[in-house]
């Protein structure tokens, strides 16, 4: 399987860096772990002490443990969720300006995996994070209930490649894209069969992307593009014998 990492203004047009198995040539790579300034917000928690109530969610990730996101997750308010386009993004948070409840000197990094619907703290235009309880308790005491925080976007560090779970049926391929490094938030996916041209997929919901082409019996390749306009192209991720319900692993962003 060959893997190309492309920095571009328009998908497939201008390549600045290439990553092939065993080698990497620098080009448009963005160094550093953080992607934006510190911004004021608030945070609460949900899901119980074992975070079991955080499973599923509006991003479509399902079991957050098996998908590799674990306890370090958050539901985002409307202002941050961006109708699901923020799914997979990573944020660093620290509790501030509340010495009674903040645990001094600690910060956490969480992945956006769910939506916090309007109502109370999550009403627009509030910037609000509803964290899993275990990760909340790393920066604040349980009894605090709600805390002021500062947050910033950071690059996601993932183990292994981007994962593609193929659901649906013939003429309806619904692909869940998970474990995305770098910016983390997928804004575009294209796919091709070994006998077809590249085709842009449409986002169905969360991070589920669909194609209505008949691709049975063909090896499948994918292009994943994140909000920073960087892309990873993974050739022949799924073999011709692929089947619905299975997960296949491709390349990964450099960070």
Swiss-Prot record:
Its main location: secreted. Residues 1-22 form the signal peptide. InterPro entries: Expan_Lol_pI, Expansin, Expansin/allergen_DPBB_dom, Expansin_CBD, Expansin_CBD_sf, RlpA-like_DPBB, RlpA-like_sf. GO terms for biological process: plant-type cell wall loosening; primary root development; unidimensional cell growth. It holds the Pfam family Expansin_C. SUPFAM superfamilies: Barwin-like endoglucanases, PHL pollen allergen. Keywords: Cell wall, Cell wall biogenesis/degradation, Disulfide bond, Membrane, Secreted, Signal. It is a peripheral membrane protein. Residues 171-250 form the Expansin-like CBD domain. PROSITE patterns: EXPANSIN_CBD, EXPANSIN_EG45. Disulfide bonds join 59-87, 90-156, 95-102. It is found in: Secreted, Cell wall; Membrane. Residues 56-161 form the Expansin-like EG45 domain. It comes from the Eukaryota. The keyword Signal applies. GO terms for cellular component: extracellular region; membrane. Belongs to the expansin family. Expansin A subfamily. Causes loosening and extension of plant cell walls by disrupting non-covalent bonding between cellulose microfibrils and matrix glucans. No enzymatic activity has been found. This is Expansin-A5. The lineage of its organism: Eukaryota, Viridiplantae, Streptophyta, Embryophyta, Tracheophyta. The gene is EXPA5.
């Amino acid at each position: 399987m060959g893997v190309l990492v492309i920095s571009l203004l328009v998908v497939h047009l201008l390549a600045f860096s290439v990553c092939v198995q065993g080698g990497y040539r620098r080009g448009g790579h963005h160094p550093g772990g953080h992607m934006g300034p510190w911004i004021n917000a608030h945070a609460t928690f949900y899901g119980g002490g074992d975070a079991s109530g955080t499973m599923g969610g509006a991003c479509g990730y399902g079991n957050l443990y098996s998908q590799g996101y674990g306890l370090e997750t958050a539901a985002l308010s409307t202002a941050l969720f961006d109708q699901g386009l923020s799914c997979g993004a990573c944020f660093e948070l620290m509790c501030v300006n509340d010495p009674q409840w903040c645990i001094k000197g600690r910060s956490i990094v969480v992945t956006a995996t769910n939506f916090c619907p309007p109502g109370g703290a999550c009403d627009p235009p509030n910037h609000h994070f509803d964290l899993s309880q275990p990760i909340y308790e790393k920066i604040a005491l349980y009894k605090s209930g709600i805390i002021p925080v500062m947050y910033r976007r950071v690059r996601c560090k993932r183990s292994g490649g981007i994962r593609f779970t193929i659901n649906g049926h013939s003429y309806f391929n619904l692909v869940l894209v998970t474990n995305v490094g770098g910016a983390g938030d997928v804004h575009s996916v294209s796919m091709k069969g070994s006998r077809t041209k590249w085709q842009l997929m449409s986002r169905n919901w969360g991070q589920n992307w669909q194609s209505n082409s008949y691709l049975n019996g063909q090896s499948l390749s994918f292009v994943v593009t994140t909000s920073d306009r960087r892309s990873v192209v993974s050739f022949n991720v799924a073999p011709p014998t692929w089947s619905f319900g299975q997960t296949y692993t491709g390349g990964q962003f450099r960070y």
